[in-house]
């Protein structure tokens, strides 16, 4: 559960009580060990909507976009994002580019994304459990900026 939170029109920030439990759930979900001493970035796909099902991006431009996101994020956090969906529809365009995981029992949605925001959203969680989320269309620059600001916490 969350014991401190601030909600704004574009995001949500606070602290999760037990990050180790979240780390364990994410490790099980992804079949990869989540290092509790590192920052976590989750990109959340709410399901197909007008925003995330339109646009002119090709598979190649999406691949380049996500490779750049992951490369620079790794320099900041030594981790890569975890891609989680509520509804799988709309993630097919990333087949062969990203590995999406189903939100276990809607945990990620209930902790960080209580409402459906168009496009996709993200959350950055520090090693101490402090987090900042951003609702709606994501930019690499915002993810990097949030990761840098929480890296020191």
List where the protein language model places each region.
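Short active-site neighborhood of thiol/selenol oxidoreductases, capturing the structured segment around
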Residues: 14, 29-55
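A short, hydrophobic beta-strand/beta-hairpin element that forms part of a small beta-sheet core
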Residues: 119-134
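Start-of-domain marker
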Residues: 1-23
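N-terminal targeting/trafficking signals and adjacent low-complexity tails
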Residues: 24, 36, 107-108
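Thioredoxin-like thiol-disulfide oxidoreductase module
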Residues: 88-118
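Loop/turn elements at helix/coil->beta-strand transitions in domains of secreted/extracellular proteins
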Residues: 37-39, 76-81, 127
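Mid-length scaffold segments of soluble, non-membrane domains
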Residues: 53, 58-86, 91-93
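Non-catalytic, surface beta->alpha helical segment in thiol-disulfide oxidoreductase systems
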Residues: 131-152
């Amino acid at each position: 559960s969350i014991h401190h939170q601030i909600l704004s029109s574009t995001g949500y920030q606070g602290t999760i009580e037990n990050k180790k439990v979240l780390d364990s759930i994410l490790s099980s979900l992804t079949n990869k060990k989540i290092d509790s001493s590192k920052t976590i970035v989750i990109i959340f796909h709410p399901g197909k909507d007008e925003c995330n099902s339109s646009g002119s991006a090709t598979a190649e431009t999406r691949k380049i976009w996500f490779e750049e996101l992951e490369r620079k994020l790794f320099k900041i956090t030594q981790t890569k994002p975890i891609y989680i969906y509520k509804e799988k529809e709309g993630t097919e365009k990333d087949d062969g580019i990203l590995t999406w995981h189903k939100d276990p029992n809607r945990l990620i949605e209930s902790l960080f994304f209580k409402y459906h925001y168009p496009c996709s959203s993200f959350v950055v969680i520090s090693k101490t459990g402090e987090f900042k989320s951003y609702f709606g269309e994501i930019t690499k620059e915002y993810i990097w900026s949030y990761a840098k600001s929480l890296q020191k916490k």
